[in-house]
Amino acid sequence: MSTIGTGYDLSASQFSPDGRVFQIDYASKAVEKSGTVIGIRGKDAVVLAVEKIITSKLYEPDAGGRIFTIEKNIGMAVAGLVADGNFVADIARQEAANYRQQFEQAIPLKHLCHRVAGYVHAYTLYSAVRPFGLSIILASWDEVEGPQLYKIEPSGSSFGYFACASGKAKQLAKTEMEKLKMDMRTDELVESAGEIIYKVHDELKDKDFRFEMGLVGRVTGGLHLINPSELTEKARKAGDAANKDEDSDNETH
């Protein structure tokens, strides 16, 4: 712990002399240690992809999932602490259910993002609680609004994106996503997500990982699907092929 944080990092309600809230900085560090999570908007779909690090071969395959279905057309992926992710996913589902009960329709993603971001921000204001060690990516698609993608940071700030990333390889993933077209078809979207996750995975530090994917769009009938078998396998094959091509290029040079 740096000396500048001494005495100013015990509470989320206290600023340091240089205007920082160290508890939020520490929450961001928890996100940076997590496996990489990305979201990409296409022409008529949004894909969420996760590099789920396997810390033990004794876990069941679906243990510690980082992708959630919030509403039938809304998906959520998280980087950071899995337990925090489960908690916030339940909060988001409750917000969606309350909206549907009151207005008899699905909650707009922008409204859900605003509500969840406000909840996350509230946990940065009081000394009795700690900020969530979590970065949240929300995705949806419908006939009226089309594809939508938002990200919420541990501070509670939120923005809309064409593509975004969180986790340990965030910067490398962003560099790869900046090369993409912004109006990709669903099959291109899925393959690009697989290629990026496999490319940013660091085999020296984290040997085993499981690729997981969430997809919502016209091809899914407006439903958010987690690990749709055919498309997920397509993404994994594209990622594996891209990884092998990169390895062969490195050997050549």
From Swiss-Prot:
InterPro entries per the UniProt record, alphabetical: Ntn_hydrolases_N, Proteasome_alpha, Proteasome_alpha-type, Proteasome_asu_N, Proteasome_sua/b
Pfam family, one: Proteasome_A_N
Gene3D superfamilies: Glutamine Phosphoribosylpyrophosphate, subunit 1, domain 1
Source domain of life: Eukaryota
Modified residues (Phosphoserine): S248
UniProt-annotated stretches for the region Disordered: 230-253
Cellular compartments annotated: Cytoplasm; Nucleus
Keyword annotations from UniProtKB, A to Z: Cytoplasm, Nucleus, Phosphoprotein, Proteasome
GO cellular component: cytosol; nucleoplasm; nucleus; proteasome complex; proteasome core complex; proteasome core complex, alpha-subunit complex
Biased composition (Basic and acidic residues): 231-253
Family: Belongs to the peptidase T1A family.
Protein name per UniProt: Proteasome subunit alpha type-3
Native organism: Drosophila melanogaster (Fruit fly)
